[in-house]
């Protein structure tokens, strides 16, 4: 069931983030992530929803609203969107993106940003974003200073 995520969900979020980290690369810092989530979940400028079932969190989208430092514009941007491999192909991610989009529109933002940067089905994810009305904008580049962190990425 898709619902708002709360501080009580942090262990389930971290468990899903571990799966994401195993798939995308060893990037998770569980203690820091838990601390940050405990601080931001429930804030008016933070969107956090997930498909949470008895067996854990299957899918999540967490985003935030912020003013752009150089533009006269307010952005809603996702911080993470991820679906457990066992539950891909369903409608969970679609529902989360639509909910995030509606939330951001209600917050009267100027732009909404979604990214596919984990190296997990980036093409498929990009097509999903496009089907939901999002347009490709620009180019995102990574420079791996610590290359071992990005060994699994096909960026």
What are these regions (language model features)?
Residues 1-30:
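Short amphipathic alpha-helix that is part of the acyltransferase structural core
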Residues 26-48, 61-71:
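A conserved beta-strand-loop-helix scaffold within acyl/acetyltransferase catalytic domains
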Residues 115-117, 135-147:
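Conserved catalytic-core motifs of GNAT/GCN5-like acyltransferases
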Residues 113-124:
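Conserved beta-strand-loop-alpha-helix junction that forms the acyl-donor binding cleft
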Residues 1-8, 147-155:
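Conserved N-terminal entry element of GNAT/NAT acetyltransferase domains
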Residues 95-111:
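Conserved acyl-CoA
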């Amino acid at each position: 069931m898709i619902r708002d995520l709360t501080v009580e969900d942090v262990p389930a979020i971290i468990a899903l983030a571990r799966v994401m980290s195993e798939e995308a690369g060893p990037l998770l810092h569980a203690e820091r992530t838990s601390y940050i989530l405990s601080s931001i979940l429930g804030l008016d400028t933070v969107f956090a929803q997930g498909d949470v079932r008895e067996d854990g969190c299957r899918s999540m989208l967490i985003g935030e609203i912020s003013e752009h430092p150089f533009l006269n514009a307010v952005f809603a941007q996702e911080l993470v969107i991820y679906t457990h491999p066992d539950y891909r192909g369903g409608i969970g991610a679609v529902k989360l993106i639509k909910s995030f989009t509606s939330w951001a529109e209600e917050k009267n933002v100027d732009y909404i940003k979604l990214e596919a940067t984990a190296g997990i089905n980036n093409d498929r994810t990009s097509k999903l974003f496009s089907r939901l009305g999002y347009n490709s904008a620009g180019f995102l580049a990574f420079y791996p200073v610590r290359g071992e962190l990005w060994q699994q990425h096909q960026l």
